[in-house]
Amino acid sequence: MGVEDQPQTQPQTQPQQQPQMGYQPQMGYQPQAQMGYQPQAAPMGYPQQPIYQQQPQMGYQPPMGYQPQVGYQQQPPQPVYQTYCHDDHQPLLHANVVVTTTQPTVIRKSNSNEETAAVIVFIIGFFFSIVWLGGFFFIKSKSKTARTFGILSVVFFFLVLVIVVIVVSVTVTAAEKIAEENKDYYYSTSTGYYSTTGYYSTTTSYTTYY
């Protein structure tokens, strides 16, 4: 048989390895060659088979005709709106907002004025009792001192009023008794005599005792 009658054999090629997603080749990796191994020559009339040589994986190179995927731009995350449902059994959590405000210091002179007026009314009432009636204006005062003097003024006014009523009633009663006693000491005496003319005449003498 001649050389032409021998069957033609196709050269065997190594299948291309598909790239693994997320796999990074190891840097510096070199294939280890077997010691003493030599490729055998093809027999006469057969085409020489290509010798497979393992190449180091120095970074993956895409095969010819492969178009890399175009990376798309990641959209920013959309805001998530969370709704809260009110439950009568579960209290809602609210953020405590603390607001600090500075208030100016206001010096109120009304209390001191009320205290002074209440003291004046209380003192003048000893000379003119009717002035003690002004204590009614200080009974509901916010100042404790003014309220105290106001109450004292009102109490003293009613005490003096009761004393005056008692004194007047006693004086009137005593005056009536004195008048009755004086009336008893006041009397008249009558003496009668006959005159020479035969007529009866009377003389009245009044004696008043003081």
Curated annotation (Swiss-Prot):
The chain crosses the membrane at residues 119-139, 148-168. Residues 1-40 are annotated as: Disordered. It is found in: Membrane. This is Putative transmembrane protein DDB_G0267530. GO terms for cellular component: membrane. Keywords: Membrane, Transmembrane, Transmembrane helix. The keyword Membrane applies. Its main location: membrane. It is a multi-pass membrane protein.
